């Protein structure tokens, strides 16, 4: 007959194992494109199918991604639809090469892909874009740009569309982004948005490597 002590030890171990299983079940990992909801947040993970990329959803607004190789991806958590709000993010962002950390999203009618870039790797994403002006928000000047994309992937399939960019001069990997300040600045420069589709705090990588673990709220 087992002793009370051994029974207690068994149940303690079983309880710990159950807790660990429950914690693991909160993480959903993907290596191919996926969208949906996770713990109260919308998530989007797009990849061109190249390279070695693993995206994982964590508790609440947390996500992580690791990547390497010759591929392109955009991944993160946020809201659907997007819009004017204060977006808070924190965590670790460790790129090696071409990568961005941004508030990222789309509108429709017109079809616009937009970036509020908070940090980036070795390549400034505004390179080759047309500068339209600046806006000061959340403790930094942001440079505003537009660029055109022809026959490229979009939320409406392969399409031609415009990209809007706000690129922060003082890079950071945590803080609060007041998105409405950027949307208003863009509008004042004739850069109209349409109806909001999703908006996420995204990590993007292109022919690079790195890791990120970001929590959004």
From Swiss-Prot:
Which GO BP annotation is one of this protein's? xylan catabolic process
Q: Does the keyword GTP-binding apply?
A: no
Q: Give me the reactions it catalyses.
A: Endohydrolysis of (1->4)-beta-D-xylosidic linkages in xylans
**Effect of pH on activity:** Optimum pH is 5.0.
Q: Show the InterPro entries listed in the entry.
A: ConA-like_dom_sf, GH11/12, GH11_AS_1, GH11_dom, Glyco_hydro_11
The residues responsible for catalysis, as annotated, are 113, 204
| Enzyme Commission number, as recorded | 3.2.1.8
Q: What does this protein do?
A: Endo-1,4-beta-xylanase involved in the hydrolysis of xylan, a major structural heterogeneous polysaccharide found in plant biomass representing the second most abundant polysaccharide in the biosphere, after cellulose.
Q: What is this protein called?
A: Endo-1,4-beta-xylanase A
Recorded source organism is Penicillium citrinum
């Amino acid at each position: 007959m087992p002793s009370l002590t051994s029974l207690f030890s068994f149940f303690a171990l079983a309880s710990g194992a159950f807790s660990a299983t429950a914690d693991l079940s909160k993480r959903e990992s993907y290596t191919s494109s996926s969208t949906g909801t996770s713990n109260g947040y919308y998530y989007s993970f797009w990849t061109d199918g190249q390279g070695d990329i693993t995206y994982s959803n964590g508790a609440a607004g947390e996500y992580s991604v690791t990547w390497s190789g010759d591929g392109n991806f955009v991944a993160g958590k946020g809201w659907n639809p997007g819009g004017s709000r204060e977006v808070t993010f924190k965590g670790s962002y460790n790129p090696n090469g071409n990568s961005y950390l941004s508030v990222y999203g789309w509108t429709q009618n017109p079809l616009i892909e937009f970036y509020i870039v908070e940090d980036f790797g070795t390549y400034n994403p505004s390179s080759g874009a047309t500068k339209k002006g600046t806006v000061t928000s959340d403790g930094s000047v942001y440079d505003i740009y537009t660029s055109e994309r022809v026959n490229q992937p979009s939320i409406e399939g392969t399409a031609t569309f415009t990209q809007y960019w706000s690129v922060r001069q003082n890079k950071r990997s945590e803080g609060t982004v007041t998105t409405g300040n950027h949307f208003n600045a863009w509008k004042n420069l004739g850069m109209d948005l349409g109806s909001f589709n999703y908006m996420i705090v995204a990590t993007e990588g292109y022919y690079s490597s790195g890791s990120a673990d970001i929590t959004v709220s």
